[in-house]
Amino acid sequence: MKVRIRDFIETTEGLYFAVNTYAHPKNKFFAFLRYVPYEFVDFKIEDNNIREINGRKYIKMAESKIAYKFLEEKFSKYLYYDETINVLMHAIPKEDVKRILRPKERLNEIINEENNLNELEEKCRKLALILEDYGVPIKSMGVSGSLLLKLNNKNSDIDFVIYGKDMHKKAREALKQAFEDNKLKPLSDDFWKIAYKKRIKDKTLTYEEFVFYEKRKYNRGIVDNTMFDLLFTREWDEITEKYGDKRYKNLGFAKIEGRVLNDDFAFDNPAVYKIECYNDEDIKEVVSFTHTYAGQCFNGEEIVARGKLEEVIDKSGERYKRIVVGTTREAFNEYIKIKR
């Protein structure tokens, strides 16, 4: 039994968790709580966060602090203090896994079912076939998020997954060409405003800055008036790190400047930027656990970053430092920007 980022796990109680890392302890899976059955909830709920499938209502956990509080009060067995990073994590013991939902399998289901698709499924199928026309094979695609769980509503986006770093780059190039050929549309100002409101919870990026960075990523677009993301997940042979290979020590917060040396996994989760740091030569990388700063900068660009400073201790004895952006999902006062 193995999982990777963008997979979802359903527990025996019907809770849905999104897998958020590639390396897991022996008897648990790290994954973040995303949906819970309505009957477990006793706090105020926004209508847009209520979903339903087969007559059962679910609540989308839109904020990380609410998700943590819910687990502390109702399902503390799904909280696990990870000593390698010294952080309290959401984690599912393997004996509590009811099933694993995989994006590739769900997309194949949609591709092969021409009839009886709902509106969002039809749009997802159309997107997949357009990307296939530009040379991206179906076998390198999947769909995650609410559409994977069949918990989508009229306001849902499409979390479209591309597997493998080379294929994700090809898909972004395909999207750029599809925009030029008018097969798919870039986001309008109205959609960018929705995306900005969803992503930025403080003033670390102005709206104008946000749009500047997002437009050059070519990982977002519109299919028949519905927004989609092209999300990256590693192919199995690209997953090399094992749980416990590295340990992390919190050194506080820091702001640094540097230059990007390697952006191969800039769209991953975490997004990884190998850098030359101007402030401290021991800082070798900047990583982002929030989607906002994935693909934010590219090889050769000079950057400014603020986040948690960590010492990384490899099991071989090697030590270096990194900056971590996205210590919470909202990434308050943490950022990666091009140096102006």
UniProtKB/Swiss-Prot annotation:
It comes from the Archaea. Pfam families: NTP_transf_2. InterPro entries: Polymerase_NTP_transf_dom. GO terms for molecular function: nucleotidyltransferase activity. This is Uncharacterized protein MJ1086. The lineage of its organism: Archaea, Methanobacteriati, Methanobacteriota, Methanomada group, Methanococci. It comes from Methanocaldococcus jannaschii (strain ATCC 43067 / DSM 2661 / JAL-1 / JCM 10045 / NBRC 100440).
